[in-house]
Structures are given as structure tokens and as C-alpha cells.
């Protein structure tokens, strides 16, 4: 099977074979070839790769991946990214999105809560997803937050954790103006992080628009 062979080599060259879970390999390849629901992915793997993996197994593996493999997967991803970028991560872009569920918000302790939704689904249960990527868009880190969490409160903890974990120095943080509250700017400065605030040109004053 050509996709399995070609994408399998890419998967191994990145280093994900070190995770040691065949189901992860199958899910990654299926996601690249035909991104769809877990149920449809199960059928796709059976039809095209003759892999008998039920959607229940896929859901259980998602829990395993998050609970026991997340650190290893991140380590592999970051090392691969550093190799591509010449051994150093100099720019980090941070952004946030919301992912909603076709369900009512859960109990108070549940991470799935109603909140400001980027999909206009403010009454649905959702989670907040924070994503940190390098230049050229290589993923560095992701974090999941309670659906009612204000997105501005997510940025600094994610960056601090990543910097500590990978001993980063001399880098620039880039985020849009919605995340760059005065409090976050103050925290960036106190940590001596360089930063760039993204903004819409049309919202800037005439002097800045002319300069751009």
C-alpha cells in the first residue's frame, strides 16, 4: 500500500516510531490520507489497510495518548522541529481556539463547559485549546483548558511551561492583540521574553498604516 509505505517512512523519520504503538501509526496515516470521524476512520483502516481497529479502541487510545504518551510525543516533535530549524527555536506563535461538543455542559468539575465560543456555540459544551507553534507552523505544544476559561489567561502558563521544559533562550513570542492584555505584556516583560503583538492594519492609526 503506497500511502502506508510513504507516510510510514515519514512517520519513522520524524521519530514517532519510538512511541511504540502501532495504533498511533495507523491513526496518523489515516488522518493524513482521509481525515474524518473516529467511526469512519475505523472503517477506512479496515477497507484500505486491512487493519481491524474499532472506534472504541480508537477512543480508548486517545485517553492513553493524552495520559501516558503526551510528553514523549511532544519531545519527539520538538526535537524534529529543532533539527529542521538549525537546532534552535527563535520564534513561537501562540493562539487559542474553542472546540464544541453537541451536548450540554457537564457538571462543574467537567472540563467541558459553556463559554465564549469562536464557532458561535456559546450554549454548547466546549473546551479551550491553546496551541504553540514555531516559524513555518511546526507544532511545539498544546494545552486543553476548561471551556469557560478566558483565553487571555492561557498564554503565559503555556509559554512558561515550554520554556522551562526545553530550556529556551533568546526567542520571540508572537500573539494577536486579543491575547496581549496589559497583564500579559507585564508578565512577558518581567520574564524578559521578547514579544510581537499582531494587529489588524486597518485598526491602527494613520502613522502606523502609512509606515506599513
Model-predicted segments: where are they?
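Catalytic cores of nucleotide-enabled group-transfer and carboxylate-activating enzymes in metabolic
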Residues: 68, 114, 125, 131-135, ...
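An internal, acidic/charged active-site-proximal segment
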Residues: 151-212
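Short glycine-/small-residue-rich flexible loop motifs, especially phosphate/cofactor-binding loops
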Residues: 8, 129-130, 160, 185
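Dynamic "connector" segments at or just before major functional cores
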Residues: 1-113, 123-124, 130-143, 148
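Glycine- and acidic-residue-enriched helix-capping/strand-helix junction motifs
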Residues: 118-119
